[in-house]
Amino acid sequence: MKNNLLFTEHKLGPITLRNRAIRSAAFENMAYGNKPSQDLYDYHTAVARGGAAMTTVAYCSVTRSGVSFDGQLYIHDEIKEDLKKLTDGIHAEGAKASIQLGHCGNMTHFYTCKCMPVGASTGFNLYSPTLHRALKKEEIKDIVKAFGHAVDFCRECGFDCVEIHAGHGYLISQFLSPYTNRRRDEYGGSLENRMRFMNEVMAEVMEHAGNDMAVVVKTNMYDGFKSGLKVEECIRIAQEIEKHGVHALVLTAGFVSKAPFTVMGGAMPIKTLAHYMNPWSFWWLRLALRFVGHLMIPTVPFKELF
């Protein structure tokens, strides 16, 4: 095993990893009250103790409006000390600490984000479920700046790397996909225009990351449904991301509000999903899923992605 490439040191941008095993971002649901918990600390320090070179905290929104679930983090001063404790714990086990930054766009509802959900365009998200409005240009600029601020914040908390979430139908993905982006300004229409928000975010992130933080981007290989992004477009998007000088790509697939189980390679458990829905807030959607869910949501047969 000594000569196995997996267990050799690797340079990821400005940081050196003790091996090539990285725990990529996957939602833990351990940020109770939108704050880091002891469970979150124990989980990631255990990953580091197990020998991983880097472990990634997921998911942290760059603003309050970008929180998708109650168990998620968002950038604000009250979590700084707890995040410092978390990164100290990871570093004590010999691993690097990474955090996933993003904005969920329309993948939320008022009770969670405390505001009218926003997206690339106005519409209705069945998954949340919620109505959402299109972002104004000045709001787009504010979110771009929030990504830069988030990178600075995470550096102060001791993180070595940030992973930018540009897939799965979250906000950057909503701008990229023709399914959710029906804008008629410079942020919509052609793929070049649909990549504009992503490019602005990446430029801001790379400027603030400087020479001491690694930057990784999670991006789709395809959206997983007919009117979404295809492989050819996703290749162009990946090439565009690379132009910014990012240090690695995390390849994924799927669109939570349309093809959520594409990335997992299986069909959505409609009955189970309906069972666990809040009966008071979503009673109408719960009934709809039980009776006609199989007509609304396609079955996704298992297949290997790689």
Residue ranges and their predicted role:
Residues 1-306:
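Flavin-dependent oxidoreductase catalytic cores
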